[in-house]
Design a protein with these regions (language model features):
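Active-site-proximal alpha-helix that buttresses catalytic centers in soluble enzyme cores
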Residues: 2-70, 94
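Generic beta-sheet signal
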Residues: 7, 48, 134-143
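Short, active-site-adjacent cap segments at secondary-structure transitions
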Residues: 16, 57-59, 77, 144-147
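Phosphate-handling substructures
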Residues: 28, 65-123, 184
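Generic structural signal for well-ordered alpha-helical scaffold segments
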Residues: 38-42, 121, 125-133
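Short beta-strand scaffold positions
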Residues: 52-53, 122, 139-140
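Domain-level recognition of soluble alpha/beta enzyme cores
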Residues: 156-181
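Short, solvent-exposed aromatic-acidic interface loops
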Residues: 182-188
Length: 188
């Protein structure tokens, strides 16, 4: 009997702070948009497993959606190391050469003290491949969702970085054994 899975990938609610800031693990989610949360909740399957990033913003979003989640560090955002908690403007002002070098190859380059997007994909790979069959809701980050898309759609890391993943957006992926397909919201 083939193994079927549906992944329901949700990006956490918006985070406060200055525009362009790279939030830390303890940044709060703004879960005040009750209408958006309700629209999203109505699209989710009733029976499911649910997992979130350990970041506060992902856990707060899961609670606001009424999900009982376990937390898995593999679903955490890309580690931006020394750049976490700072705006892009501050980072560039502090070290323009390092910042510019990072953006020449953002998929493979590492921020100082952090991890590359390629390394994030490797981190996500193990947990995605081990997910149970059935519906699995994952509340995570734009980078985590892009990493999952890279794996499922067999995209290069550079191409996966082209996806825009908005706060409170839903990305759906289906898997039959090891074959993936993509979808947007709704039910299958």
């Amino acid at each position: 009997m083939p193994q079927q899975s549906q992944l329901w990938l949700i990006r956490h609610a918006p985070v406060g702070g200055p525009p362009g800031m790279i939030p830390g693990i303890d940044a709060h989610a703004d879960v005040s948009d009750a209408a958006a949360l309700l629209r999203l909740r109505e699209q989710l399957p009733a029976r499911h497993a649910a997992i979130s990033s350990p970041a506060r913003r992902a856990r707060e979003t899961a609670v606001a959606l009424g999900l009982l989640v376990s937390s898995d560090p593999a679903f955490g955002e890309q580690d931006f190391g020394d750049w976490t908690g700072r705006t892009h403007e501050e980072i560039r002002r502090g070290s323009e050469a390092v910042y510019d070098e990072f953006w020449r190859a953002p998929a493979s380059n590492r921020p100082p003290g952090g991890e590359s997007f390629v390394e994030q994909i490797a981190r996500v790979r193990g947990v995605i491949e081990a997910l149970p069959s059935g519906d699995v809701i994952i509340v995570a980050h734009a980078g985590t969702i892009r990493a999952t898309l890279a794996l499922a759609l067999e995209l290069s890391p550079e191409r996966a970085l082209r996806f825009a993943i908005d706060p409170l957006s839903l990305t759906r992926l289906g898997r039959l054994d090891n074959a993936w397909r993509s979808g947007r919201g709704g039910s299958s």
